[in-house]
Amino acid sequence: CDHFGSLGHNINGGFAEYVLVDKEKVFAIPDSMSFNEAAIIESVSCCIHAVDMIHPACGENILILGTGSNGIILAQLLKASGALSVTAMGSKDAKLKLLNEYGIDTIKMDRNDYSVHEAEIKKRFPHGLDAIVDTTASPELVSKCFKLLKKGGRMVHIPSAPVFHPVLSQASLFLLLQISEFLS
């Protein structure tokens, strides 16, 4: 999103009984759709956009950072895309169990020691990952995951709130800008 704004994140009103919203931002729920279905439309659309950006190919290995609602939706979409393996990494046992029931591999994340799951990822994917999708908005976690990608690997971020901490070093950012300029 170019101008991220969300009630309860960076706009007050998430717990208000009533809230005033611009009419352009309000949509009627069709009679054929339940409230529960309508409630996840925004999350599902962001996840579909992320899958489009990743452009998963048959036989690829993809890692999802985070097992919140977006991570769980993404895992299912990517599993259906034909990727060789989809692995979700999170810290909540109940969510990891749910993903396992959907046929998705999982890695238990240790928020106090990222090297634990980093070693597990390297063991499972010794040649690196084709793509990583970040749903955590954790600069520390994301910065450690770049080295887990294969050459030409892709990383997509769909954080639930803006990240204000730079993840890339100035040198890495300069190199990315040079590569982008060369390719365009």
Regions found by a protein language model. Give the residues of each.
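Glycine-rich phosphate/adenylate-binding loop and adjacent beta-alpha elements
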Residues: 1-26
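Short, glycine/polar-rich helix-capping loops at beta-to-alpha or helix-loop-helix junctions
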Residues: 14-15, 90-98, 163-170
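Mid-domain Rossmann-like dinucleotide-binding core that forms the NAD(H)/NADP(H) cofactor-binding site
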Residues: 33-111
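Glycine-rich helix-loop-beta junction characteristic of Rossmann-like nucleotide cofactor-binding loops
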Residues: 52-57, 125-126, 147
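Glycine-rich phosphate-binding loop and adjacent beta-alpha segment
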Residues: 83, 101, 139-184
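Helix N-cap at the beta1-alpha1 junction of Rossmann-like dinucleotide-binding domains, i.e.
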Residues: 92-94, 111-113, 139, 162-163
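Short amphipathic alpha-helix with an adjacent loop that forms part of the alpha/beta core around
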Residues: 113-127
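N-terminal Rossmann-like NAD(P) cofactor-binding module of classical short-chain dehydrogenase/reductase
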Residues: 130-133, 156
